[in-house]
């Protein structure tokens, strides 16, 4: 009885964790899209400013960007975290050295969307961690649950093993909650016996 309460509580907790993670994921994906859009756009504007000779190519080193005018891969959330930080820090260093700020988008606007994404990213990692821990806890209880189910099953069948015919015995066991499923080859055998 005590195990059943713990198992049900673990099942409920896992479901809650999974639901929380799923709900937060929708909002998080919107934050990912906005951060990716602003970081990518800022890098494109920076590259165009370099092409127009408004910013020296050597200044791209402040951002950790290669001299080639390409946008780094921003598909993964980890790369967004990395490049967002590099772009924000690089722009602040360039401005502190006397450079003119890039507009449309401004680094302040990029930073706002990056910070929102970063908060959401950390929160989502927390939800994922809680879901994984709760699933591990539930999985660790499965063997004990299976043992209890098998023990109950065997006790119920042992109690009614002397009852004949077989269908009456199975009906008594069903009254105790046992559920029988016919295997595909058993169904064919039973149907062929009925047709004879």
Where are the regions that the model predicts?
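Basic/polar low-complexity intrinsically disordered segments
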Residues: 1-196
């Amino acid at each position: 009885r005590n195990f059943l309460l713990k198992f049900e509580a673990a099942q409920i907790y896992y479901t809650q964790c999974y639901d929380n993670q799923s709900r937060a994921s929708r909002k998080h994906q919107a934050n990912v899209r906005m951060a990716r859009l602003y970081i990518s756009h800022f890098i494109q504007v920076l590259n165009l400013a370099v092409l127009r000779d408004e910013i020296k190519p050597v200044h791209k080193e402040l951002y950790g960007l290669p001299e080639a005018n390409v946008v780094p891969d921003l598909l993964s959330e980890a790369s967004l975290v990395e490049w967002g930080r590099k772009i924000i820090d690089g722009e602040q260093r360039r401005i502190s050295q006397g450079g003119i700020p890039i507009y449309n988008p401004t680094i302040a606007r990029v930073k706002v969307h990056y910070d929102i994404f970063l908060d959401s990213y950390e929160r989502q990692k927390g939800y994922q961690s809680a879901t994984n821990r709760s699933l591990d806890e539930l999985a660790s209880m499965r063997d004990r649950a299976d043992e209890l189910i098998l023990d109950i099953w065997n006790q119920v069948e042992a109690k009614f093993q002397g009852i004949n015919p077989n269908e009456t015995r199975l009906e008594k066991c069903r009254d105790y909650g046992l559920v029988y499923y016919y295997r595909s080859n058993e169904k064919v055998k039973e149907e062929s016996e009925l047709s004879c």
